[in-house]
Amino acid sequence: LSYFPLGQNGFVDVRDVSRATIELMDSKISGERYIIVGENLSYKSVFEDIAISLNKPKPSKKATKSLLELAWRLEAIRCFVTNKKQSLTKETARTSNQKNIYDNQKIINALKYDFKTIKEAINNTSSFLLKLK
């Protein structure tokens, strides 16, 4: 990946989702809704951590709004011609520059929960993928 979007989003390790779901089902809590998010991070930092973990160069170019608007249109044309599924859609291009922040305090308080870091999740997944090569 050479490019990174300018946005931010909430990320969570799938193991945390599974564990929190099981803990909630096993508890006496009912009728509540929870946001299960480990960390709010910029795409730049997540993409950098992924690159480092996979021994690849870190992304260095900003995927600006105008660049992403052009990219999703070109991708749509390419996929129309090749009859393939789009990897970058209008929606993903536009949301990738939004700054979304999620609050996980409610689930932390309810379960006394401690989330894994996203760096840990990335390293766990990367080590698995690198072993497959």
Report each predicted region and the residues it spans.
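Conserved short-loop catalytic and cofactor-binding motifs
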Residues: 5-9, 34, 95, 109
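Residue-level signal for the nucleotide or nucleotide-sugar donor/cofactor binding architecture
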Residues: 12-15, 116
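A short, basic/aromatic helix-end/turn motif that makes direct DNA contacts
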Residues: 112-113
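Mid/C-terminal beta-alpha module of Rossmann-like enzyme folds, strongest
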Residues: 20-86, 109, 118, 122-133
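Active-site loop of classical SDR/Rossmann-like NAD(P)-dependent oxidoreductases
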Residues: 43, 88-103
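Short coil/turn segments at secondary-structure boundaries
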Residues: 6-8, 85-90
